[in-house]
From Swiss-Prot:
Ranges in the topological domain labelled Extracellular: 19-357
Name of the protein in question: Interleukin-1 receptor accessory protein-like 1-B
Domain spans labelled Ig-like C2-type: 32-134, 143-232, 242-350
The organism of origin for this protein: Danio rerio
Role summary: May regulate secretion and presynaptic differentiation through inhibition of the activity of N-type voltage-gated calcium channel. During presynaptic differentiation may regulate both synaptic vesicle accumulation in axon terminals and subsequent axon terminal remodeling.
Residues bearing attached sugar chains per UniProt: N63, N122, N138, N213, N264, N331
Domain of life: Eukaryota
Gene that encodes the chain: il1rapl1b
Domain notes: The TIR domain mediates NAD(+) hydrolase (NADase) activity. Self-association of TIR domains is required for NADase activity.
Amino acid sequence: MRSRVPLQILLYAAVIRSLKVVSKRGSVDGCTDWSVDYLRYRVLLGEPVRIKCALFYGYIRANYTHAQSAGLSLMWYRSATHTDHEEPITLDGTRTLKEEDALWFRPAQLQDSGHYSCVLRNSSYCMKVSMALTVAENSSGLCYNSKMRRLEKAELSKSKDILCPDIQDYTPAGSEPHVTWYKECRPKQWRSSIIRTADLLSIRDVREDDIGNYTCEIQFGRFLVRRTTELTVTAPLTDKPPKILQPPEHKLSVMELQLGGPVNLTCRAFFGYSGDVSPLIYWMKGEKFIEDLDETRIRESEIKMVREHLGEQEVSVSLTIDSLQEEDLGNYSCYVENGHGRRHAIIQLSRRELMYTVELAGGLGAILLMLIFLVSLYKCYRIELMLFYRNHFGSEDVDGENKDYDAYVSYTKVDPDQWSQETREEEHFALEILPDMLEKHYGYKLFIPDRDLIPTGTYIEDVARCVDQSKRLIIVMTPNYVVRRGWSIFELETRLRNMLVSGEIKVILIECSDLRGIMNYQEVEALKHTIKLLTVIRWPGPGSSKPNSRFWKQLQYEMPFRRPEPKLSHEQVLDASEQGPFGELQTVSALSMVSATSTAMATAHPDLRSGFHNTYNTQLRQKHYYRGYEYDIPSSGTLPPLATMGSQHTYCNIPMSLLNGQRPPGQPAHGQQQSLEEQQVNNALLPLLPRETSISSVIW
């Protein structure tokens, strides 16, 4: 019994002497605290885990058996963090249990995460250390937690071994573990160059498609234990210095720049794979680093990653000069280096003398191109541009203010028995389309002989008078017009011929079809050379009936400019009670109506003539919105005897009873009304005088 006590004392002393100091955190209540051990336990939810007391694996030179023989006790405590209050662990013997110097969780749960301290002590000695445990769930849709993977790197075309780590606690001693390997959580048909032995996966020739996550799985009782390794593949380690891509490495680059302008220099380089070493690239001016220069105008940018593949990198760095000065001129060098060497490229900045040759040529070229563009635009859209200018900034024709009509329309009617499809279209154009468009759409006032001419003298004199009162002469040139020589009337009358030759009136010649094969066409060409102010416009056909067609724009351009007149109010138009005996002749022009009325009233009764003349002439002068006329009817005298009207032409369908100043039989007395139907029954047609039948009026 006496020999046993000294033996225990010697064993206890040996244990105490075998303690080694690693990194003491401190001593609290006489217990040496080694803080948290570097080995951290990380396990997935539902997997078993064994936490071993680190005191026996690096802090003391004794194992659990020796410590227990020396009378030291091992106790376990848990805390949420290392600084929190520690509490004793309740061991249930089933899920949580103690096994010699280790603590088992079968399986681990999320609430088991924390710090576990093992304390080795007796009445006179105390030492402890903490181990961290993390329990986590699998990432969504995966068989591992992405934060618990081991990282491994492999070089392209070389071999690599992937170990299934930390599985010795789950393998019986003396036996090899049975490991199943997965890639990206799925079974894989491994190629022949990949060999599996026990807990090792060996890749003999690493390829780029070997990049991925490798999971090893072993069976431990009723539990599964998984370990995942992320493999990244890199290019082989380089043994060469970086390569400068821009500017050229073996050539001096000269840049001629103007002073005062900004400058930006860029250096690009290629770095082979050098492990975890960052690329080194920078600018220097002469022998000085850019950051050592006193100028704030000159600065260097951060290194920019252009691209990266398998660890090989292409990077760039920029040098910026806000405003180039004389002292900034010189050599700027871009340097690149790694563990195998350094290279550089030089850019020389020099001042550029001002040369205006290129600038002058460019300016003249731009002006020439602009001039060509404007000329082409004017050629293509001359009429549209002139109409736009005239409508917005033009003024009305002052020289034509004393003329009553904007245009006189000359046209040859076609006999109905000679009509064809072409002549019908020409007749429709001349009688309907042309007047309607010019009068109703554009607001022009036309003189159309068949509609507006009432004879006051010979036919030629009437035509000359009406043409003289018009600003333009529109000749609708049709084959029938050429055959009948419709222009002869303008050659027979001296006044008309002088107007055409002297340019007193502008002529608009509208060709409705091809006239070159028509008889008398040579005379048409001679007529064109005779007219001083002539514009020839071709009518394309019914397809150009829209107002925005080229034909109507050109015709509007040749017509005199006039601004749209405001619509007449009710007071400006004669009502039925104020229109007098000519109320039903609203389509007859004022000038023609006055002439016809004066001729008719000359043969009427003197009293009737006097009363009607005074009343109607006053009303016409005051209320008609075109113009007023003063016309004195002779107190005596008669018109020449009227001849019987032939079947050639009717100037205007005017009741003879009104033109002669007579009342039809049975008409009420003065001041009384007669129905329109009764008046029309007794209407007669105005016959032509003998002198007016000398020239056919088929041609207007």
